[in-house]
Amino acid sequence: MEENPLQCTICKNEFEEPILLSCQHTTCRKCSTGSPSCKSCSPIPSTSRSHTPHPDKLAAFLLDASKEEMEECANCEQISLPMFYCETCQQSLCLVCRNVTHQARMFSSHKIISSDERSKVYSSSLCKDHNEPYILYCSDVRKLVCIQCFNGRPLEERHSFISIEQGHRLCLERIEQSAAKLRFYQSERQEELNVRQRVLDENASNFDDARASLYQLCQQIIDTVMTTRETLAKELVKQQEQSDEQCKRQIKEIEAVMGPVRLCLFSAQILCTTASKLDVLQLCPQLQKRIGVLLDKTIDKLPVSSTPDSIEVRSDLAKALEPFLGMSAAWCPISVSREGSSSNSYKRGSGSHKAISMLSKFQATIDLAGAFGELFGKVEHPLRQLVTALSSTSQQVLETQRDLTIRRCIIEKEDVEKLVKTCKKIEAGLGMHSAALDGMQSEMQEIWQEQLDRVRRQQIIYREKVEEILNLRETARQILTAAKQLVPYVSCILNMNAMIDPKRCHPPDPAPMESICLEITGIEPNSQNRILAIEKEEENRRLNQEAKKKEELAGQSAVMKTLKHGKIKRKEMNRMMLNTNRERSPGGTDTALTSPCIRRLTTALKEETASELDAEEFLDEIFELSGEQYDEVVDGTLTEEDRCSSALLLSMEISSDSISPLPSLEQLLGRIPLASRVTSNIGFSRGAMLQSLNDVFALQKPPTPENISVSEERNVLASAVRNAEKRKSGAGLPTNSDKDEVIEKEEIEKETEKEKKKVIRRRVKKVSEPSEEEVTTFTFNAPPDCPFVPQEIFESDEKLGTFEAKERVLQSLKQKMNQKTE
């Protein structure tokens, strides 16, 4: 009998202030006071006991709808069925008043419906926040909104607003879908409830039959099997209690779920039929949420029904009767699942095919050999046919039952009668087969007696072997005791030997290579351990080599630290470096030499070594000019070709660890190509060479205020130098008187220069013939340091190119070097 969904399950009365619990049950507020859990499903553990009960709006709405009274007619104030309702006038009308008041043409646009179709609004039609009437429905949050709520939403969220009519249709569709799922859920649970109820009844009848058969069997040998009977009866009762308890618990769970299911279905029916649109829109989310919670609930699977065969009655009784009747449990029917347990070793078989299926082919061949096999073959083949027919018929009966109960199909009567006839035929065949087996029992008894005699003989042999094994075990225990007594003597002797001769106690360790070979040979060819061992040895070998290299480098660095340092480095301010990052002209000349960009060499750029300083001192001594050689100098003015010819005076590459030799005669005379005479470090070698030559020439020919002009600027353009030389070329060559004056002043200046310890580098400009006219002087912009080139090397009427000028200068320097060495 189904309960009223609007009735409390505790007080059995109609709801008063209904509240919703976490288990989806609805009770009265006064019934749930002081109870932390639901009384209907208290045995079921609750997953959310901290859930605070809140009012059940669905139940309250159903209560209000069920108590709705018929309204009186607004015109005659009487109730006469049928009643109508004018939605335009918002008034109730009886049939007479409707015909009287709404017959005029002016009332033709009024919408009049039956009072049964009218849906009364029980909830508020105004917004709680703004006290404005609802005009739209938001499909995202599933709430009614007023004009203020609509204006307060941003523009990107206003796409979810729909009219109340559309929202009403949408909610009705959702309710119908959820209700359909809930109906299907209800049908499944109802079917499970019915199945478990039938299982409960079947278990009761089956266990009653088993108990009766057990008592009948035990009466024959009541004295010997009384204890066994009580034990088996307790096991039966225990299994029955477990099965009944599980079924009852599941039945209680399903019954507890059915109450909220009926309430939700009733709510869905009311909302879809008589509820107003606003009520549907407001209560639809709650109903769907509750339906979803109910659909998520699951019920445990149906417990496996146990039969009396699982208790293994015959096997236990055979074991109990074995001391009295001499019957062994091995003669009982073999079960399908034969395990090693003493109490569950054998089960009753339902046919010979199960016994044979548990045996191997070899065992079946041995057991079926001889006379027993011939007799067994007469009944085995017909029995297999009957088993196949029985299996097919049982499957057909099962499908027919499912068609009737689950699929709700219509079954033809002829089909059922055909199944009944088939079952009767199979039963008759089994009866005939059983009679044939009973007739064969006498013949098989003789065969079994012979086998029993053979078994007895085998048992005698077995007992002899058991006694022999027992004797051997006793002997083994005695030997073990003797061996244990020898252990302290052996350990004492070994300790004394270790004190006397320790080497004999510990065998020598194998060599490293031998241990590696033993380890590798003990590993499988393709094993991971062997690969790891090889990789480990390779890694150790590599680490040893790196350690040796580090030791060698450390020794070399220690030796280098013990060496003496060279001479004191000169100041970096006196070093020059030529910027060689210039493009060369198509004719082969270096444009950087015509107007070189000279810069000071800083410590960060290059550091002089002692060998470089020694090489410069050696060059200073070689290129030192005497006074007689200087007398031959005619003019000290510089031309464009002179400056260019001194650019590649000598090419000398000086490394940090060795000094390159001076250029050979073939290189100076131009017999070897120019490219072989120019080194990669041309900037440094040229600067060192020119610096030494300037020092020598400055000492031999000190400048005077009359014939020099000092240039403080660093750079000078080649075109400016060329124009200045052209302007001075008209003055002529210097006279011999000027030379004498220079020689006399030279000796005086040598002594003063030694005291000053400072070399003043000047560029001297001479005027061939003194005149009262002003001599035009040109201020150089810090020209690069170049050696003084005597004018007598070149003929006055000969115009030489840059390459020829370089060759003339190199030949002159070579001659001076030869004179110096002689």
Curated annotation (Swiss-Prot):
The keyword Flavoprotein does not apply. A zinc finger (B box-type) spans 68-115, 122-164. It comes from the Eukaryota. GO terms for molecular function: Hsp70 protein binding; transmembrane transporter binding; zinc ion binding. Residues 526-558, 738-769 form a coiled coil. PROSITE patterns: ZF_BBOX (PS50119), ZF_RING_2 (PS50089). Zn(2+) binds at C73, C76, C97, H102. Gene3D superfamilies: Actin interacting protein 3, C-terminal domain, Classic Zinc Finger, Zinc/RING finger domain, C3HC4 (zinc finger). A zinc finger (RING-type) spans 8-42. InterPro entries: RNF207, Znf_B-box, Znf_RING, Znf_RING/FYVE/PHD. GO terms for cellular component: perinuclear region of cytoplasm. This is Probable RING finger protein 207 homolog.
